[in-house]
Amino acid sequence: MACTNNAMRALFLLVLFCIVHGEKEESKGIDAKASGPGGSFDITKLGASGNGKTDSTKAVQEAWASACGGTGKQTILIPKGDFLVGQLNFTGPCKGDVTIQVDGNLLATTDLSQYKDHGNWIEILRVDNLVITGKGNLDGQGPAVWSKNSCTKKYDCKILPNSLVMDFVNNGEVSGVTLLNSKFFHMNMYRCKDMLIKDVTVTAPGDSPNTDGIHMGDSSGITITNTVIGVGDDCISIGPGTSKVNITGVTCGPGHGISIGSLGRYKDEKDVTDINVKDCTLKKTMFGVRIKAYEDAASVLTVSKIHYENIKMEDSANPIFIDMKYCPNKLCTANGASKVTVKDVTFKNITGTSSTPEAVSLLCTAKVPCTGVTMDDVNVEYSGTNNKTMAICTNAKGSTKGCLKELACF
């Protein structure tokens, strides 16, 4: 009987061990494969190394596959450390809502051969309710390849990889993170709706080529707030087909300012309307607030309902600039008048200093003049001593109130 009891006790302990061990193994499986509502995926538990040298692409992609395949709220954790990754494709639709928590640094590979089909670095496609947040960096490591950029010499140049590209993403948020030294654009949104970009930092040297901060096209309901951008091209650029954009509390500089355009380069571009830029500061930028359309425009489109208010210029060149004969690097294919119509544009309470005598330049065309331009309390003065503050206004129609007398175009 004692032997039997001992045998039964041993059998019971063996079964208990197997159950516990099985639960542990099952728990490990849940970490790697989403099942049930909610989940968290730490890339280091999937094989990623934070030493800045080991390729962690596979681990990050595995984390995405698991999170996107799970229901409920799913989180991908990028912990502290430096994680070298190649091209990442985060494709939806997802079963649940995915948050990418960036506490560490993602480093883009500098090996351009790893970006297939002229691809981007991090490309997110057809994902709703996506959140990218944290205090970490998305480092494009652009200095290693900027010398390969030929876009200042060729009209149809081969572009380098953009850092963060979101296509067909709705109800998304990017907050807190820093986008650093992109090879080309830092952030690009295409056909996105209802996106919030807040408390983001975007930084690259002022002479880095085509490193636009945030670009958008064919998108609507975009809000950018409390964001600091200093880059080598436009801090923010609003492309064709975009509407209902609110930009507030943005500090820009260095860079080429906050721009609508360029417009008209390609056929079948759509209108731009309902753009509001408010409570922003531009520091030593090449342009301030700007609308630009190609002089050899291939599209007929309209820019309307544009409102700039409470904008402070700190020694920025060309603070207010509408350019309907835009031709970067003099590489346009033909001369001609832009087919882009600009109307109903308001500049209200624009103050500060300009590093160029031309504080206001409205360069519109005789064939398609700019109309409904309102200049209300525009008081920007030239900071130099070798000339006077002035405005150049060509083929523009509108009204002026409370402006520096030298800037009263109408």
Curated annotation (Swiss-Prot):
Whose protein is this, by species? Answer: Zea mays
The free-text tissue note of the record is: Pollen.
Q: Tell me the first and last residues of the signal peptide.
A: 1-22
Keywords attached to this Swiss-Prot or TrEMBL record, sorted alphabetically, are: Cell wall, Cell wall biogenesis/degradation, Disulfide bond, Glycoprotein, Glycosidase, Hydrolase, Repeat, Secreted, Signal
UniProt key word Secreted: yes
Q: What is this protein called?
A: Exopolygalacturonase
Q: Name the Gene Ontology biological process terms.
A: carbohydrate metabolic process; cell wall organization
SUPFAM superfamilies for this protein: Pectin lyase-like
Per the UniProt entry, the Enzyme Commission number(s) are 3.2.1.67
Gene that produces this protein:
PG1
